[in-house]
Regions:
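Conserved substrate/cofactor phosphate-moiety recognition/catalytic segment
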Residues: 18-60
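Glycine-rich phosphate-binding loop used to anchor ATP phosphates in small-molecule kinases
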Residues: 49-113
Length: 188
């Protein structure tokens, strides 16, 4: 199985991810690396060019990495941030079309890749300012809502996504994730 931690910024995804460093392939910092190497705009400043690069990079990673891994972000996150920034993207109509195209692309991808498990990490504590991620709580809540709405939409169309909500302390979250991974036979 392939595992994706998904949720708004500052919910503890990277903290959870690093508990698996020595047990499986870890995919992290994709967006930060693109921002550093290509200068793309992210968070509230995200634009069509940057979101397109992020989508393409994640599709490349997901399509070409078939071995077991865990990632601290996924396409659900990219769709959510894109929805948040739609009003800032060129013309509203063009932004809406772009999002619809990306959701359809995600649906097609999901139908062909049923070996992905999503761990949804909701907002349970304040975001820490690390100098990169947005600390705007309203933006954060919007990102979180968009992810939940996307999962609800996917469920409504019968997508069959494997989604688990993971809450609690870091230890409780890890226990939940590890139990699910054990059920899939991926860790002992």
């Amino acid at each position: 199985m392939r595992y994706i931690l998904t949720g708004a910024q500052g919910t503890g995804k990277s903290t959870l991810l690093h508990h698996f460093d020595d047990r499986m392939k870890v995919i992290t910092e994709v967006v930060r690396n693109l921002a550093k190497t290509e200068g793309i705009n992210v968070n509230e400043s995200g634009d069509m060019h940057g979101q397109t690069r992020i989508f393409d990079t994640y599709y490349d990673i997901l399509s070409n990495t078939k071995e077991q891994y865990i990632s601290d972000r996924g396409l659900t996150d990219v769709i959510s941030y894109t929805c948040c920034n739609m009003s800032r993207m060129h013309a509203q109509e063009e932004g809406q079309r772009f999002i619809e195209d990306q959701i359809n692309r995600f649906i097609e991808f999901s139908e062909k890749n049923d070996d992905i498990v999503y761990f949804y990490i909701p907002i349970e504590f304040d975001v820490e300012d690390d100098g990169f991620r947005s600390t705007d709580e309203e933006f954060r809540k919007e990102v979180d809502k968009n992810i939940r709405d996307l999962f609800e939409y996917m469920e409504g169309i019968g997508s069959g996504l494997n989604v688990f909500t993971v809450t609690g302390t870091v230890e409780e979250r890890l226990e939940t994730i590890e139990e699910i991974m054990k059920n899939y036979g991926d860790i002992q």
